[in-house]
Amino acid sequence: MTTYPVPQNPLLLRVLRLMDAFSKSDDERDFYLDRVEGFIFYIDLDKDQEDLDKIYQELEENADRYCLIPKLTFYEIKKIMETFVNEKIYDIDTKEKFLEIVQSKNAREQFLEFLYDHETEQEKWQQFYVERSRIRIIEWLRNNQFQFVFEEDLDFSKHILEQLKVHLFDAKVSKELTQARQLLLNKSKVYYSNEALNPRPKRGRPPKQSAKVEAETTISSDIYTKVPSVARRFLFLPEITSPSSLTFSEKFDTEEEFLAHLRGGGRLEDQLNLAKFSERFDSLRELSAKLGYDSDGETGDFFDEEYDDEEEEIKPKKTTKRGRKKSRS
């Protein structure tokens, strides 16, 4: 069994980056979290075969070092959307429309598109998604016996955070870092409490609605000293400093890409109207078949004849107008 360096304090993990990895893990991409240093890397089929062979060999030889991040199942995705609609949406018509979308094909993308047409519901979704994702990640880390602290939860200076990463495996450090390590150890125990998985609702009267100002989290640089050379080109290092940058979409990697799609492509309402028009057209074809136009050719003639009749009605009117003009002259 391979022996690995032992970290001298809980691993500093970025919860927003983990949320992004959890949402992007699918049939084409596998994400892994390192137990030794806490870095994330992912494997997809776009990489060179030689590099893929090397990283798979690394995973096989050091299987106990890396944890495969779980993939969202179809049931879990549907459950997330249904829970949000039932718990957070109060308008009956809007709720019915959301539930209709949840049951449809390609529900995940349609759900987001419809959501972005309702600003109030969008803000509630963002908060709901972050809270539920955080609980899911903490539960997974606990089940895999990680000792960790989310960097976004700390009030340390950037310098201290980076020094903790540089000296992660050093037993002897300065007094300042020794104190910081003790604070990290105390903080890490909070994630193993019951409240971490069941946050208490805030008591008292809700605050007055005001303009929402989202402060970006100050994060330190990525400093990893024990990354195997074969894993370096697979590292997952997105710079996510606010929850609004996260996306639930399975087709787009960032919120900016998804919004660009909404601005450039057709809206959900247009797609629904097109679907309704298509259904009515099919019903008309069925009706024509019942009237005796059963074959494909006859069905086509039925529509063509109707169109020709309209043209014949228009032509006499044009000749009449021309005749009047000549008589006046």
UniProtKB/Swiss-Prot annotation:
Signal peptide: none annotated. Residues 292-329 are annotated as: Disordered. It comes from the Bacteria. Residues 295-313 have a biased composition (Acidic residues). Residues 317-329 have a biased composition (Basic residues). Pfam families: UPF0158. Belongs to the UPF0158 family. This is UPF0158 protein CT_429. The lineage of its organism: Bacteria, Pseudomonadati, Chlamydiota, Chlamydiia, Chlamydiales.
